[in-house]
Amino acid sequence: MKPPGDNAPAGCPFSGARAAQPAHEAPHVPGDAAGETGWHDAQLDFSKSMSYGDYLSLNSILDAQHPLSPDHNEMLFIIQHQTSELWMKLALFELRGALDAVRGDALPPAFKMLARVSRILEQLVQAWNVLSTMTPSEYSAMRPYLGQSSGFQSYQYRQLEFLLGNKNVQMLQPHAHRPDILEQVRATLEAPSFYDEVVRLLARRGFPIASERLERDWTQPMRHDETVEAAWLEVYRHPQQHWELYEMAEELVDLEDAFRQWRFRHVTTVERIIGFKQGTGGTSGAPYLRKMLDVVLFPELWHVRTTL
């Protein structure tokens, strides 16, 4: 209780603290409110400097959605795929950085970049949850406006597949109408994949890798090689002696595991929305995507688990 005649507001009865002053009597703190210096001293005038939107080129990004149908749900479809392309751009950037690091025998930076790619793929997996809010009826209303465009025509996704070792010369054809893009995709097809460079790393570390595995036709998909598996077997049996290679192996398994999850969610989302209809690009749709689930990117790393 307050003493008689004491009109001061009471503080906490247990701490003996003074009560806060009423708002209209609160002391002024410079820069704590809107004024000439801005809100909490934040800069508000960007007429002569770069703003957040300027730095991110938001005008270009946010003006890149152009629905062709009158259907409300097409905006979701467009943004889902555009954001996926942005994440794939970052995944390619990180993978190529990791590849350069492996070539230079700088493995710790490569581990960081590979871990980031795995997290990017997790982000892409979660993105399917947003697209799956589209019902079959909603997709059917906008599908005629898509023409023959299809996700398998994504030149960034194709480069990602090639960089991870799933090579297919036929997949150049969808980009023949764009010579600049075709050149990018072809260069990735004809270069060693990330795993090819890791196998070369094994050879540099003294493991006897077959010469035909080290110098092969890079445009062809990888096949299981006994000498590569034997090298990984030694690494897994004696991880303390080959710690960097052991960590590299596990980073690659993490990466392929995340990629498999992305593929699986792709299949289930397609089945949920269009069932087993033919894809807009002419593929069989869900059956084609299910077949892709059987693709193994780093075969020796999976088979060695049985051998151990």
UniProtKB/Swiss-Prot annotation:
Entry-linked InterPro entries: Trp/Indoleamine_2_3_dOase-like, Trp_2-3-dOase_bac, Trp_2_3_dOase
EC number: 1.13.11.11
Pathway of action: Amino-acid degradation; L-tryptophan degradation via kynurenine pathway; L-kynurenine from L-tryptophan: step 1/2
Annotated binding of heme, by residue: 266
Residues that, per the record, bind substrate: 77-81, 139, 143, 280
Family to which the UniProt record says this protein belongs: Belongs to the tryptophan 2,3-dioxygenase family.
Protein name from the UniProt record: Tryptophan 2,3-dioxygenase
Natural source organism: Burkholderia ambifaria (strain MC40-6)
Taxonomic classification: Bacteria, Pseudomonadati, Pseudomonadota, Betaproteobacteria, Burkholderiales
